[in-house]
Amino acid sequence: MRLLSKFLIFLFFIFTQTITNLYAGIASGPAVHDRNVIPLPRPPTEPKVDKVSVPINPITGILRIDDSGSRSTGFTKGLIGISFNDFLKKGETLTIREIHTSGNGTDYLELGAKFPVGLEGSTLAFRVGAIKYDVGQQNAVADATGNSDFIDANFIKPFYKSTDLNLSFGVSAIRASYIENRSITISGTAPGTPATDKINQRADLSLYFNSYDKVFNQAGTTGKISFSKGDNNANHTKDDLGGPTGSFSKVTAQVNRLEKITEQDNLYIRFKGQYALTPLDAAEEFSLGGLYNVRVYPNSEGGGADNADSGFVINFELERMLTKNIKAFAFYDFGKISIYENYGDSTEAKSSLPISGFKTNKNTYNLKDSGLGLEWEAMPNTKFNMLWAHKLGNNPGRRTDNSDFDRTSTKDLIRFGFTQQF
């Protein structure tokens, strides 16, 4: 216990130094909405069977390079993560993760720790992160640069277990700060102080579940539903594009389902969405673009400059194993947003569209695409992947020059990626 206490003190010291020395950020810069959303894993189609325990690898890691970045911060993105497992023999994991984009557009660093806490199956996790960005490539006039940091804690406790259904509840809290500087403000004058300087605090109450069924053949489903309540303090903001100050609340949901059709074919469905109970700040809003959303669109696409209060994205992937090491898939992505909560309830709300610089005349609209992908496992733990995405229909939220959020207007997109696990 004394050793564990020393480790926690050491970890807290690292967290503090990280926040002090390396900031990371947004405001209305590059999208980091998903930073606050820990993605759900791909579910297995059958319950795990207890096997003979195997030794825990003390150090594991991942290296990923792809072109899922953005025009504003650099398309090429690299991720490296290292985990130290069970080094105190308490079942704990310490993780270090860094993400960097080409052109020094974005630098992100995250430290995390996860511990069992004595109650059967319960875990306590901490994360601290920081990001620094420069989006001058996209908007040289404003030359926006910024930084943000966050720290969060998450407690999860199982309360129901069976062969086909497992339920857990979770309580978490996050505190994040955002600072953005611009060479000029919206009105065209020099701000003199940070255009955005705000603090967000949020608490979440969540229900986690995973289940197995044979509705069609054999399938597994994982999910999470959360109620969030928080406060946004933007008292020091001079020229914020991000949204209202004060308390806010919303409901979010994530569901992943993997349906085993045959020994070679799977249907993989992913859903995530949120419903705003109050108007939201930019850091809590929802967007439709990016590699894990409607893939043909850029990060932060949807809703103009501020993104949207409510929305959802659903992805369908039909997978087929061509050989033992090669998987092909066809996909369809659909996303829908509502930019303003309670839009139309006031004269002020009705005059909020179109958003300056955008042809966004609809408060609610959708984006969609389809495409093909290929994944090749060249050797154990080494994968190459590529996908082609094609835009379906028009973008109702495009800019006045008919380009997307990142000022491009492509109808087709090809992406490549490389992943090495060790």
What name fits each language-model region?
Residues 82, 374-383, 388, 406-422:
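Outer-membrane beta-barrel "beta-signal"
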Residues 182-325, 331-357:
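C-terminal outer-membrane beta-barrel translocator/porin domains of Gram-negative envelope proteins
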Residues 74-78, 105-109, 147-151, 197-203, ...:
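Residues that define the transmembrane beta-barrel architecture of outer-membrane proteins
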Residues 59-61, 87-94, 118-126, 161-167, ...:
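Repeated loop/turn-to-beta-strand initiation elements of outer-membrane beta-barrel proteins
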Residues 22-125, 161:
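Outer-membrane beta-barrel initiation region
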Residues 128-151, 157-158, 162, 176-188, ...:
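Outer-membrane beta-barrel translocator/channel fold
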Residues 84-86, 115-117, 157-159, 207-213, ...:
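Residue-level signature of outer-membrane beta-barrel architecture
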Residues 63-67, 96-100, 126-132, 169-177, ...:
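Transmembrane beta-barrel strands of outer-membrane/channel proteins
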